[in-house]
Amino acid sequence: AYIERRESPGSEFINGKPYPYPTGDTPDGANCLSDCMYRPPRSYSHVLDRGIGPAPVGSTRPGVNGLYDMGANVWEWVDSGEGEQKATAGGSWWYGAFRMHRNDRATKPRGTAVVYIGFRCAKDMD
């Protein structure tokens, strides 16, 4: 879940509230091809490169906890455990808003290298 943990998050978010998307109550403000920002889904089958790709770091508005680029910019590897299949979360520019929902996960084979999966260097907030 995307839970706001800042003591004074400002007017867009409420401390302690769980949000369905990393951008808040809606996917508005994320970087994805079709239904982010409330645009109707479209067919991209005629576009060979599937869109413009990931947005530059920090170019989307900050979301829950003031973090940038958490919504649909690139899938993030979230599982480094044993086994061939590894978990990803957060969606990417290649997919629509439904893939960035807090309950959505995908798996990819270990060693997958594609333009819509990345990683995030992170530190515990405590």
Regions inferred by a protein language model and the residue ranges of each:
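Functional-site microenvironments in short loops/helix caps that host divalent-cation chemistry
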Residues: 1-106, 115
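Conserved catalytic-core segment of clan PA serine endopeptidases
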Residues: 112
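Short, structured beta-strand segments at or near domain termini in extracellular proteins/domains
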Residues: 116-126
